[in-house]
Amino acid sequence: MPKSKELVSSSSSGSDSDSEVEKKLKRKKQVVPEKPVKKQKPGESSRALASSKQSSSSRDDNMFQIGKMRYVSVRDFKGKILIDIREYWMDSEGEMKPGRKGISLNMEQWSQLKEQISDIDDAVRKL
């Protein structure tokens, strides 16, 4: 028989057990597992900071804005060149983060898209 989280109010004798069940449900909802904090060694923090600055500047060089918060970027991922067309959003610290909406094209797909641009333009003009 499936367990239900609904509380059925009955006579006053059952109200004590109902309140106990309610308290247990509230406790379960409040418990949120915390993510473990990663500790960095003193030498690592400076290296990580330097690499993040370097990657962000190179990322900015390869980003081309095509809309309000939409960019085309060229990047290297596991030795393969990818062209990303993606929406970005601003986090609470004012840093741009990539959004869910987007696509990554490998070089073959990018070449096929470039070859079909004139056909796509013609289709847009017809509409």
Swiss-Prot record:
Residues 31-44 have a biased composition (Basic and acidic residues). It comes from Rattus norvegicus. One of its GO terms (molecular function) is identical protein binding. Residues 77-101 are annotated as: Interaction with ssDNA. It is found in: Nucleus. One of its GO terms (biological process) is protein homooligomerization. Gene3D superfamilies: Transcriptional Coactivator Pc4, Chain A. This is Activated RNA polymerase II transcriptional coactivator p15. Its main location: nucleus. The record marks A50, S51 as: Cleavage. Residues 7-16, 45-57 have a biased composition (Low complexity). There is a cross-link at K68 (Glycyl lysine isopeptide (Lys-Gly) (interchain with G-Cter in SUMO1)). Belongs to the transcriptional coactivator PC4 family.
